[in-house]
C-alpha cells in the first residue's frame, strides 16, 4: 500500500474523530470518537515506522504503548460514565454539571 493512501485514511479517521468529539452530546460517543483519534495516530506511527526504517520497530512499540493507554482510558472513561449515569440518569454532556454542586 502506498504511503499517501494510508495517510489519507488516517487523516479521514482523525477528522471523523475530531468532528464527532466536537459535535457529540453523549459521553459514550465522545469516548468512541477519542478512540478513533488515537487509532488514527497509531496508523501514522506504524506507517512511518515501516516507511522510513523497517529494521527498527520504534513506531510499532510506541503504537503498542498508545493502545495500552487507550485501553486504560476507555476503561476509566466508561467507569466514570456509568457512575454519572447511575447518579444523574443521563449521559448527556451538557446535563452533567458535577462541579456546580
From Swiss-Prot:
GO MF: oxidoreductase activity, acting on NAD(P)H, quinone or similar compound as acceptor; quinone binding
Pfam assignment, any one: Oxidored_q2
Any Gene Ontology biological process: ATP synthesis coupled electron transport
Record field: transmembrane: 2-22, 32-52, 61-81
Reaction(s) catalysed (UniProt annotation): a plastoquinone + NADH + (n+1) H(+)(in) = a plastoquinol + NAD(+) + n H(+)(out); a plastoquinone + NADPH + (n+1) H(+)(in) = a plastoquinol + NADP(+) + n H(+)(out)
A GO-annotated cellular component: chloroplast thylakoid membrane
Record-listed E.C. numbers: 7.1.1.-
Top-level taxonomic group: Eukaryota
Compartments it resides in: Plastid, Chloroplast thylakoid membrane
Record keywords, A-Z: Chloroplast, Membrane, NAD, NADP, Plastid, Plastoquinone, Quinone, Thylakoid, Translocase, Transmembrane, Transmembrane helix, Transport
Chief localisation class: plastid
Classification via InterPro entries: NADH_UbQ_OxRdtase_chain4L/K, NUOK/Mnh_C1-like
Topological type in the membrane: Multi-pass membrane protein
Cysteines engaged in disulfide bonds, as pairs: none
PANTHER family reported for this sequence: NADH-UBIQUINONE OXIDOREDUCTASE CHAIN 4L, NADH-UBIQUINONE OXIDOREDUCTASE SUBUNIT ND4L
Main function: NDH shuttles electrons from NAD(P)H:plastoquinone, via FMN and iron-sulfur (Fe-S) centers, to quinones in the photosynthetic chain and possibly in a chloroplast respiratory chain. The immediate electron acceptor for the enzyme in this species is believed to be plastoquinone. Couples the redox reaction to proton translocation, and thus conserves the redox energy in a proton gradient.
Subunit relationships: NDH is composed of at least 16 different subunits, 5 of which are encoded in the nucleus.
Family the entry assigns: Belongs to the complex I subunit 4L family.
Protein name in UniProt: NAD(P)H-quinone oxidoreductase subunit 4L, chloroplastic
Amino acid at each position: 500500500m502506498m504511503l499517501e493512501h494510508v495517510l489519507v485514511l488516517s487523516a479521514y479517521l482523525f477528522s471523523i474523530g475530531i468532528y464527532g468529539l466536537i459535535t457529540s452530546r453523549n459521553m459514550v460517543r465522545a469516548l468512541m470518537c477519542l478512540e478513533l483519534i488515537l487509532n488514527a495516530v497509531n496508523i501514522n506511527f506504524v506507517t512511518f515506522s515501516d516507511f522510513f526504517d523497517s529494521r527498527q520497530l520504534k513506531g510499532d512499540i510506541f503504537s503498542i504503548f498508545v493502545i495500552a493507554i487507550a485501553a486504560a482510558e476507555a476503561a476509566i472513561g466508561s467507569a466514570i460514565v456509568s457512575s454519572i449515569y447511575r447518579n444523574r440518569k443521563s449521559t448527556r454532556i451538557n446535563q452533567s454539571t458535577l462541579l456546580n454542586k
